[in-house]
Each structure stands twice: as C-alpha cells, then as structure tokens.
C-alpha cells in the first residue's frame, strides 16, 4: 500500500508542478547583470539562487513522459545509471536588441523559391507568427546572433570508456542578416563561415570557407577547402546535406551544424504542434565550468546541466521519395521565445533513433543574444558522443 501511495503522489506532483502556468511570464534580461566583468570570459549566473525542483532519472522518468522528447527517453533507457535531468524553475530570459524587436514588428517577410529563400527586412525575426514548418526553420537560421563571432572552435569525440579525440581551431562567422551590419559583401547573403584547424597537428592549417545565400535555389552554397598537404584551395560542393566531416568521425552531417542549415529541398516538412517540454536552458553553470569536469563517459556531466519547462514548436522532416539522406526522418524542437533549435532526433531508415542532439541555450546578456552553448550529438549505435561548437569560459583551451 505504501509503494502504491508513493507512486500516486509522484504522478499527482507531476501534474501539479508542471502545467501551462509553470512556464510563467517572459522577463527578458537585455543588459549585463550586476558585477558582470566584460573583460572576463565568465558570465554571472543570474539565477544562482534557483533550486532544483525535480531530478528525473531512470526510476521516475515514466511519470513525466508528456514533457520528455523521444531522444531524452532513449537517453534514460540507454544510460540508466548515469543520465539524469535536473529541472529548475522556468526563466524566460532570452532577449534581443531593441532594434531587432522594432524591425520584427514592422517586417513583412515571405518565403520564396519553394521555401529555399527569404525576402524581407534584414535584421528582423522573419516570421514571428510562424504558421509554416519552414517558418520555424528560417527563424532559427536567421535569428539574431550578434554581428561577428570570432573565437576558438574546440570539438571532442568521446568514446564509451572515456577516451576521446579532441581538436581545436579558429573560427569567424559573419552574420549578414543583422541590422548592425553595413557591408556590401552581405548583399543577398545569410552570412559567411571560415574555420582553420589548429589541433591536432596532422590536420593543422586545414581550412574551410562557406558562403551561404538567402536563396539556395537561385544561388547555392559556395564552399572552398584548403589542404595543407597539397597547399591547394579547391571548391567543395559536396560540403552540404549529409556530408560527413572527418572531424566528427561520422557522428554529424554538414546540415546538422548549428542544428540545421543549408538547402531544405530533400525533405517534406510538416508541423507537429506546440508542446511543453523539458529543455536545456540558461546553462550558465555549464558555460562557466572546467572543461575537464564536463566531459564524462556516455554524455556530458549532467551535474552542470539545467533543464526548464519551455514551450517548443515541433517540426518534422521526412525525406522525399526521390531523394536520399542518412537521416531520412528528423524531429526538431524550436524554442518559442528565442526561435532557436534546442533539440533534435535523427532517425535511420528503420525509424530508430540514430542520433539525439541537444543545443542548450543561454542568454549572453551583454549582447543580448540567446545562443547555443554547444551542440552535443549522442549516437546510440556506437555509444559515443560529439561535443562541438563549444562556447565556454575556457574557449581558448583544448
């Protein structure tokens, strides 16, 4: 009787604690918090006083299935002894500059070229009242990210035994869909990405340049690579779709960078509703942590992760009959406040989850901009994971 009563109480608490009202009101933080030092790589956690409301683990995750994604459920089942999710109060802190909000209110963007392009006011969130599935994808791609992102580009492939391959590089990302960019180079472009490998030594100086247009049908992606072995630059039209880069060791595709990017023509897209889900959010403790502490077996150290109940727009992508992709089915989750992707499940041809991806969001309040602190790709077949696009207070360390 005691066991039954305890179970009933847990289920009741799930419904009482987590409802539509649990998400709360949006209170953006649009300026640096007290004692923030712009010369430091540290970001003060504005929610340091928050307490864990609930720890979800293998013993109780079934009580919260309504708020979990299929990928999260698979993580509990695959790593029952180590994977936990600490649930904190929802703090809807994401913000953008006032100029972006004003442009969004006055915008009249529209999709063109069968969804492969956007025509609208540069600097706005193109589709604040999104109705089409590709509206959410374009909002994610074109959301405000700051002007230029310059810094290190560390990545890690972690094996089940804890051993890892690590690398680093230098990266420059120019965001052309930005109200503060006044550059003739940006005419008709989404932006530009340049990367150079600095570690490991055998790949040092290998470089990549990608230029992305606002209309992939009219002006497809242009990419070049530099091979230090031959000292030659060559065009690289294959760096798109499901191209597997060597650095990811087969764990991630070209169009998975930043969640999703590039041409959309290989999929049929559909809306799958708006739901409340536990998602990685306001992960200041992770950002400020020691790199040695966060890289653990099977998945990142969940002690430093924070999950909140947020509203997400869910989009499905199913490969077209006459196309191919190693991920023939994908489910993407977009934060309703920031429009950024926070999670994705990539399925194989048997409708089994191949990869689960998390893109934990954090408000860089000095900008302000809500960006993913990293991309963590968990591969269930090999039990390895890829941690890349890492932003942290240790950005220059490998």
Model-identified regions with their sequence ranges:
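Bacterial N-terminal signal peptides
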Residues: 1-9
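Short, intrinsically disordered, charge-balanced linker/junction segments flanking boundaries
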Residues: 11-14, 396-398
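Solvent-exposed N-terminal domain segments of exported/luminal and surface proteins
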Residues: 15-221, 227
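Short amphipathic beta-strand/extended segments with alternating polar/hydrophobic composition
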Residues: 167-169, 207-211, 235-239, 357-359, ...
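Extended beta-strand-rich segments in extracellular/periplasmic secretory proteins, especially
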Residues: 167-199, 255-332, 342, 348
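Coil-to-beta-strand transition motifs
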Residues: 188-190, 201-204, 216-218, 230-232, ...
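Acidic, serine/threonine- and glycine-rich low-complexity intrinsically disordered segments
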Residues: 207-283
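C-terminal soluble interaction/assembly domains
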Residues: 320-397
